[in-house]
Amino acid sequence: MVPSQEEPAAERETNEAQPPGPAPSDDAPLPGPGPSDVSDVAAEKVEVELTRSAGSEPPVPPEGGWGWLVMLAAMWCNGSVFGIQNAYGVLFVSMLDTFKAKDDDNMAFKTAWVGSLSMGMIFFCCPIVSVFTDMFGCRRTAVVGAAVGFIGLMSSSFVSSIEPLYLTYGIIFACGCSFAYQPSLVILGHYFKKRLGLVNGIVTAGSSVFTILLPLLLGNLISSVKLFNTLRILCIFMFVLFLAGFTYRPLVPSTKEKESGGSRSSFFSRRKLSPPKKVFNFALFKETTYAVWAAGIPLALFGYFVPYVHLMNHVKERFQDVNNKEVLFMCIGITSGVGRLLFGRIADYLPGVKKVYLQVLSFFFIGLMSMMIPLCSAFGALIAVCLAMGLFDGCFISIMAPIAFELVGPQDASQAIGFLLGFMSIPMTVGPPIAGLLHDKLGTYDVAFYLAGIPPFVGGVVLCLIPWIHSKKQRKISKNAGGEKMEKMLENQSSLLSGSSGIFKKDSASII
């Protein structure tokens, strides 16, 4: 066996200098190890080295190469999933015209639940998706999710009433989108580290681009080929998403690959399920910084989506003579894409958890812009508010995944993002209906928009605690490490003193 590089040179020379001879007798045993002991020690060294190389340390992100193709695939995923969801307003009008019954006065309420259920299910399923991502990897999870989404969207084009859409569009299609979307956030952290903020900005900008273009495309398709054929055409987006999922080549082994010793198997191989205690990694919440982050983000989102849902109706009531009300959402989509690229790049220059300050800044401005909506007496002022709101919306979204990687690391980022998105589904579902209820009671949206600006401020204040908690933890670790180092130095010094004292006594005795 080739000797280890860490083995002292003097020891090697001593072993080489000993000539072979007869086996020692029992009366004079050699102090050194025998041949069997040497082989055991060598085997232990090899085992330790193999254990270290078996995946205990995550691989270094390549910062490019195949990762650029992964980035484009993730960009298509974000664009197709949230572009379709954000353009539901166009489908909403077509569904009303297609399924409307003369004796049904609640048709708008029923139709609205289709889109609301779909958006909520995407985020609600994310904690479950994170488990599948850890168990089977990003590639398998994303591909299967896109296939399920394709089936749900295609089956939605064959219904004859609004109720089956709750299952086909609101649950099956949304769950498939969730399984395809969440791995697209996780896989980027495996391929990028230094450029992760910029890459996430580019990927999340895909939803802005699709949000700008899809409403125009859907409007033309519905007017020419009607609703059902439009849904079938949208299935093309899901099929491309299915193909894009195959680009998520894994760098970090999944849980199943670790349990099987890292051996590769077929794509749809049968695997033994993990125990429940290993499925959901609740130990993440023992990390105080992540627990605060997972509480602060949903708290800020109680008012986050109120302008996106009720802005059109507010403009209709406040500015009756304005025809192009859709330009407000186009402004939000354009500046949101700019914000994702801009702040994603800025995040690359902020070390560690200081990236959280960008989210704090974005929530403060989003809350302020929400409160300014009722104060706008001119449509031009409202356009300016929407431009600013979209810019900081892009800031908040683009750095979500980089912060998760900073707080828990790449190995646990999947479930960290999944838990967060699951928590986000609650305020996203509850906030807009509360604003609608206030409008029904008061006859105006003014109070609703004022109140919608409060939760982003509160959530931003909570997020400010994260850098403080992190720095306090680092100081404690440094202090403990310094104490251990001092104790070790004192032990070494005392051992040297005791050794020198023994030598002095031995020499004195021999002289006497």
UniProtKB/Swiss-Prot annotation:
Disruption phenotype: Deficient mice grow and reproduce normally, show no gross phenotype and no obvious neurological defect. Deficient mice, however, display increased plasma, muscle and kidney aromatic amino acids (AAA) concentration under both normal and high protein diet, although this concentration remains normal in the liver, but it does not alter thyroid hormones homeostasis. Coiled coil: none annotated. It is a multi-pass membrane protein. It is found in: Cell membrane; Basolateral cell membrane. Residues 1-63, 133-141, 190-201, 254-291, 348-362, 406-416, 470-512 are cytoplasmic. The chain crosses the membrane at residues 64-84, 112-132, 142-162, 169-189, 202-222, 233-253, 292-312, 327-347, 363-383, 385-405, 417-437, 449-469. The keyword Transmembrane helix applies. It holds the Pfam family MFS_1. It comes from the Eukaryota. Its main location: membrane. One of its GO terms (molecular function) is L-tryptophan transmembrane transporter activity. PROSITE patterns: MFS (PS50850). The keyword Transmembrane helix applies. Residues 85-111, 163-168, 223-232, 313-326, 384, 438-448 are extracellular. Residues 1-44 are annotated as: Disordered. GO terms for cellular component: basolateral plasma membrane; cell junction; intracellular membrane-bounded organelle. GO terms for biological process: aromatic amino acid transport; thyroid hormone generation; thyroid hormone transport; thyroid-stimulating hormone secretion. PANTHER family: MONOCARBOXYLATE TRANSPORTER, MONOCARBOXYLATE TRANSPORTER 10. Belongs to the major facilitator superfamily. Monocarboxylate porter (TC 2.A.1.13) family. Sodium- and proton-independent thyroid hormones and aromatic acids transporter. Mediates both uptake and efflux of 3,5,3'-triiodothyronine (T3) and 3,5,3',5'-tetraiodothyronine (T4) with high affinity, suggesting a role in the homeostasis of thyroid hormone levels. Plays an important role in homeostasis of aromatic amino acids. This is Monocarboxylate transporter 10. It comes from Mus musculus.
